[in-house]
Amino acid sequence: MTRISRSAYAEIYGPTVVGGVGDRVRLADTLLLAEVEKDHTIFGEEVKFGGGKVIRDGMGQSQRLATDCVDTVITNALIIDAVTGIVKADIGIKDGLISGIGKAGNPDTQPGVTIIIGASTEVVAGEGLIVTAGAIDTHIHFICPQQIEEALATGTTTMIGGGTGPATGSLATTSTSGPWHMAAMLQALDAFPVNVGLFGKGSSSSHGALLEQVRAGAMGLKIHEDWASTPASIDTCLNVAEETDIQVAIHSDTLNESGFVEDTFAAFKGRTIHSFHTEGAGGGHAPDIIRAAGMPNVLPASTNPTMPFTRNTIDEHLDMVMVCHHLDPSIAEDLAFAESRIRRETIAAEDILHDLGAFSIMSSDSQAMGRVGEIVLRTWQTAHKMKLQRGPLQGDSERSDNERIKRYIAKYTINPAVAHGIAHLVGSVEVGKLADLVLWKPAFFGVKVNMVLKSGMAVSASIGDMGASISTPQPVQIRPMWGSHGKALRTSVAFVSQVSLSNPAVSELELNKRLEAVRGCRGVTKHDMVRNNWLPAISVDPQTYQVYADGQLLRCEALAELPMAQRYFLF
């Protein structure tokens, strides 16, 4: 038997597992090391495309018809996923869905083939690359359409939120108000290669005013203090959600005008709700909205400007609050409102609560106190910071960080999908789900994508000079691909409510995107948050703002330097 060294094998086919010991891959320039847990490959039967390689007719490529073969195969990829784990495999894609995770090839010449390659199969070389599920951002202010190109370039394939453009209401709140705006925005978003979902305005104590937005195509409702986050509006909104099986997101009452945090919790009546920026700098009862992260019916999220806690975090937030919420720095009350939201102690505690799995979701808050292109990046910066300051998680070691890696990737993939009733289609690298996949070079993981697939078709990729003789000459830039154009936009989905599918006005919009109803939103609890379901008793000292979880003080220092930062963005 011919043998090659482990390092030579990794160079050719990517990392593997030998003798129960997995190769390790560093994520970007962080301290995080991913160790391969399983390899579906049969040594000596690997498939690879190219001159003199295996995927040729009669070798790794079969003579079977398209019905038996995958449309696309990603070969020898390292999957990093909260559900599937950290595994090496070939990935088969058929009719826009992940059809297989296993061993690709020609079953007529090779053993153990679970993914059949034929003349109808395209190949994406995954050797040496990491594959993840596309990120799901549940806090999008749809202010400008250029956000979508930025989001795709950093691995986001599903954008959920609200807005109508740079209108004053949309600059502050993630809601698309009323049936007319709902229809117009669904039609506008039909031109972009991302999955979308819109929140209606949930700040109303009128049952009918909320229901008509859900019937118009809202996949959820958003309660926001700038429109009113009162106990009456919360109760009414949750009543409508219970009737129509949609999710409710909340930005609660910073000023405690209509009640304190206990009154808001009482208005929930044990019903499920998605709490935005649960730390509070992005908005919510001052100073103790962070207590919501310990409630079983609350699905707690962060927005990315507070993540992780650095020496610049506090300083940049004051101006963000003033601009976002239409405040006037010359008015003392407006300034006091902004300052009440920014607390060093709760921001520091947020990092630790993420690391322990009490915070379940990461999102952006795009252009409204958040950066649409940094949801993935800031998640991994936080994981790095916590390893640096707190050491390995339980189940990890100095050798690898698999448990921490799987916990953190869940925050922007499977958990937002579960929270909003779309996990049957997106959120993980699993058979049967949309092939919304992101390929990364390990050195650029979480920073700059290599390629983004929507339903198996490339929509964004790092590509060189389009006038050059090959695809790699500089400048290499992340650019839209064919899947971003024409009727290929049907590879994306518009998520709506189930009741809207029977509304003739919605079908008359004649969208290219296929409409998919959200489902199972009302039965979700914190226990369903994958790898992020810790329920501590959280308290906040009203004088010092110090945060305690199960009686333990949560404290960490701000970092002065982060990975995934300047060295990647000088050019």
From Swiss-Prot:
UniProt-annotated binding residues for substrate: H224
Enzyme Commission code(s) on record: 3.5.1.5
Cofactor binding summary note: Binds 2 nickel ions per subunit.
Cofactor (UniProt): Ni cation
Primary localization: cytoplasm
Catalytic center residues: H325 (proton donor)
Reactions performed catalytically: urea + 2 H2O + H(+) = hydrogencarbonate + 2 NH4(+)
Keywords recorded for this protein, A-Z: Cytoplasm, Hydrolase, Metal-binding, Nickel
Protein name: Urease subunit alpha
